[in-house]
Amino acid sequence: MLIIISPAKTLDYQSPLATTKFSQPEMLDKSQALIEICRELTPAQISSLMGISDKLAGLNAARFSEWQPDFTPANARQAILAFKGDVYTGMQAESFSEADFDFAQQHLRMLSGLYGLLRPLDLMQPYRLEMGTKLANPRGKDLYAFWGDQITEKLNQALELQGDNILINLASDEYFKAVKPAKLSGSLIKPVFLDEKNGKYKIISFYAKKARGLMSRFIIQNKLTKPEQLVDFNLEGYEFDAGLSAKNELVFKRAEQH
């Protein structure tokens, strides 16, 4: 099984590292091309394009100008330890063992607007470039056009390497749009997480993001390799609901949190 997740806007380049192992991103030539486009933007243009404050735009203009592709542990950090949003709060990679990192390196991929597809231990320098950004480029009007089939091709290679054809989609819709399901040489399974609110079960964004991280951790720490094992997921009160589930959509429910 290969898991895909979204990246995070919040980054952490300060905390102690849980592993010294690292790898290099496989699509850095593409990242370099995007960086060169982004370096042409003024902070005001970045603010408008990304819908962020002037202060954040200034920070990201500086990141674009400082980015250089000779990544080392001194100037970059492993992606799984650099991202710090809700998904990564659920995953808690800082508590992984070396065996967990090894399993994750084979079975987990992070989608990225700048890096395309990252393995957990791939070094990355800080950036902000969400997949939905309408950044004009030689291939079209946005990043979906820029990446085209390339991310899907990388996923197919990863599926082949890890020995089966099951892709677990734990990414957001914005990021999964960068994958072409018709061109995937595998079958998709999408876990869905419903939380109770006032007696009704629905997707609550904050909880759902964290649950995607919890599911990733459950698969990695238990070294799961078969989709039927996913129904045992029970972290933080979630339970599988067979009645609401289908072959390619597994539904997990949780009682209201107090």
From Swiss-Prot:
Species in which this protein is naturally found: Yersinia pestis
Transmembrane region(s): none
One CC-aspect GO term: cytosol
Record family assignment: Belongs to the UPF0246 family.
One biological process term in Gene Ontology: response to hydroperoxide
Lineage, top ranks: Bacteria, Pseudomonadati, Pseudomonadota, Gammaproteobacteria, Enterobacterales
Protein name: UPF0246 protein YPO0462/y3714/YP_3720
